[in-house]
Amino acid sequence: MSSHHQILQIRSDPFVLSHCCRHTRLTSSLTLQSPLKQPFSCLPFRWRRSYRGGVRSSTTETHGSKKEALVSETATTSIELKRVYPFHEIEPKWQRYWEDNRIFRTPDDVDTSKPKFYVLDMFPYPSGAGLHVGHPLGYTATDILARLRRMQGYNVLHPMGWDAFGLPAEQYAIETGTHPKTTTLKNIDRFRLQLKSLGFSYDWDRELSTTEPDYYKWTQWIFLQLYKKGLAYQAEVPVNWCPALGTVLANEEVVDGVSERGGHPVIRKPMRQWMLKITAYADRLLEDLDELEWPESIKEMQRNWIGRSEGAELNFSILDGEGRETDKEITVYTTRPDTLFGATYMVVAPEHQLLSYFVTAEQKQQVEEYKDFASRKSDLERTELQKDKTGVFTGCYAKNPANGDAIPIWVADYVLASYGTGAIMAVPAHDTRDNEFALKYNIPIKWVVRNEANSSDDAKQVYPGLGIIENSSTLETGLDINQLSSKEAALKVIEWAERTGNGKKKVNYKLRDWLFARQRYWGEPIPILILDESGETIAISESELPLTLPELNDFTPTGTGEPPLSKAVSWVNTVDPSTGKPAKRETSTMPQWAGSCWYYLRFMDPKNPEALVDKEKEKYWSPVDVYVGGAEHAVLHLLYSRFWHKVLYDIGVVSTKEPFKCVINQGIILGEVQYTAWKDQEGNYVSADTEERLNEHQQVTIPEEKVIKSGDHFVLKEDPSIRLIPRVYKMSKSRGNVVNPDDVVLEYGADSLRLYEMFMGPFRDSKTWNTSGIEGVHRFLARTWRLVIGLPQSDGSFKDGTLVTDDEPTLEQLRTLHKCIAKVTEEIESTRFNTGISGMMEFVNAAYKWNNQPRGIIEPFVLLLSPYAPHMAEELWSRLGHPNSLAYESFPKANPDYLKNTTIVLPVQINGKTRGTIEVEEGCSEDDAFVLASQDDKLRKYLDGQSIKKRIYVPGKILNVILDRTNVKVTTK
């Protein structure tokens, strides 16, 4: 250590400071100042010196065995941060190398004696907008896992493809006249180029698209198997029909009565549609969830969607105008037969098949108007708990089978024809929705379940729970369930209903059969013929697959409900080959879900013309080990894939009951924080916390550089009395907050983007994008580069070779390395990618304090870095003298002997007198020991405000701090 006087200061690495503040520049009041043009923290580590009045100390820093002359200060200030390592040259170079040498190709005939790892992204829809920075989040995570497993000796399957059929391409074709095939291929080319620019280790030899006939041949083949098993059928069902788009929409594609795409009106109307009987697999889909290593939240969403419940079907006789029973009954499904005596009205869905039979003439017009009103809502909107309940009295009554009471029949849209029987018995005392409806329309309320835990004051509050039954007996029917528990009463009601013919026990599901047809062109043709004479449906022969789409130039809706394919007359009109009878091809196409239901299987054997997948290959690669995608697919996509997989399991195509062993949903990357202020009519700012009627003022967006944080709030820098509102939104073109990854790669490099997205926070959590935050990880990569390669020359370029030595590593170096190996490995395995990066940062910080960089330390670290920052790692590996890619090098393993925390108690003297002790690791450096001493409560009072003359350190023995009482005092706090 230098003998000249030092100013006592507790230093934090500037990179660590930037890391801690990475989510917003306003979270800390710390300011790093430097006389240089670049912030002090942006300078190469070796250029950081004690500056006094802007004059740099003349001392030089030793690194390895070499003394390096510092470049001039003028040259230093002219080198921009993004030039401190040559990512512009490195990244394209290694991307070409990987592609030219097919480094990540998985052979068709792999060595099956080795373990396998199949990691898969939910493949993207190739939209015209291309990727935004939210897409690479999941792709980077799967790439890190794939690279780790390759280096651990696994056969890795890591493919990419395109979910390319769908409504957006068809709408674009209608608007522009461009064929959807042309648009799709163009979009795929752009997506592929963007993905390659990010260095993902996909096996591009296995690339596929759902729009390729060689692929959808097998989608059609699966449909035929479903048809043969009676799982594909036609039915008249109420659907979301969009006249403007000319197609049926899923509930998820309808928002506030209009189509999500285009905002076109949507109505409910019955149509004959192809359906898939997913309900036949409801129990298996539910039971097998317990065997899956999925997040409990995803499994619970699937359980709720399937919605298995046990209850009873009960029959209510319809009464005529004189109050007499008719021969017509309304059957309801209820999970609470114990509350039967509390049913004071009934509700039927607007689509109920008996509604036209019992509605009275006086109420008919109101009912018809209400049916039209309800037809403009999706099922999701109709069943939203928070919505205002609406309905119309039908004018008719039904008989409560338990007590003989005549109860009114209402029609309301919160009851769905597709669930249960399309009718409910309403018990307003014990159901929140029924209670809201009853209060609104002055319908009687009868309490029949007592909650013994409630006070008497709560006795007349709605109570949906279980309890003791009361007010539930009658001589007319002989049914008496008073004083029974809810469970006992339910069993007794079911037994009574079955004995008297008033109902039966029933298991019900919320899950509905899958509506499988779309009235559009750009989708897989359904391989079915309809005979002209009888209307009978006939499956086409498997030998005729694929049934390809005909070329069409007009994709506009027909206006009649007929799909666009009906315009291809010569394609539609055909004959049944087996009988010679005239027939027509089915003109509806499959939904976009179809191609994505099974693509994971085709990736195992993508070029096979004879089978969907080779049995041996499927047996080896199944199931997918890790499947990563957005939470928006946690229900339907996964449920549909599981359904098809179970059908394929039943017919012997696949060997596993489930397709995906582990599913992970990544969080959403939100747009950058937007700061909103308000101005009054005079143009003066109005503070957000002092004005209640902000909506009357003009909103303005304030740039981040004009904002500061004050306490828990954000305020105008020029006027801190003006409070602002920070908001974050999902990235969207309409908000103008989409960040293009191409721009980030150009500015900072692909490795920086990869590293930043993994470092933003826990992988499964939502995060806010902050472009300034990427500078921190870029600095880390630059420091890593300089640690191995050295300083740039005066022109900003770097010499060939490295600073690595062949010295034997010290015990401290080995411990630091193996601690890093253990942390990085564990964190990748646990998908805690951000803390794995923190471990590498700690290593680099420690390595800068060493006098040398031994090969036995640096090479393993480069391998650790490679899954995260593969371009830089490949370049460093090459410069370290290795001729081949590191992609298949063995990933380092931590030696437990170096992970033991061996600590010692170190005496600390001040001016030769022992003042206390500190606990340090064996091999602790002088600087680290001094920092610990200065942070110790007992020792701080001797050091605070003092100037250090020198330090005497005997490792493992003693630290003696000699104070200079004549020098200027500087606080340690």
Curated annotation (Swiss-Prot):
Its EC number is 6.1.1.4. Disruption phenotype: Embryo defective. Developmental arrest of the embryo at the globular stage. ATP binds at K733. A motif ('HIGH' region) lies at residues 126-135. A motif ('KMSKS' region) lies at residues 730-734. It catalyses: tRNA(Leu) + L-leucine + ATP = L-leucyl-tRNA(Leu) + AMP + diphosphate. CDD domains: Anticodon_Ia_Leu_BEm (cd07958), LeuRS_core (cd00812). It is found in: Plastid, Chloroplast; Mitochondrion. GO terms for biological process: embryo development ending in seed dormancy; leucyl-tRNA aminoacylation. It is an enzyme of class 6 (ligase). Pfam families: Anticodon_1, tRNA-synt_1, tRNA-synt_1_2, tRNA-synt_1g. HAMAP family: Leu_tRNA_synth_B (MF_00049_B). PANTHER family: LEUCINE--TRNA LIGASE, MITOCHONDRIAL, LEUCYL-TRNA SYNTHETASE. This is Leucine--tRNA ligase, chloroplastic/mitochondrial. It comes from Arabidopsis thaliana. The gene is EMB2369.
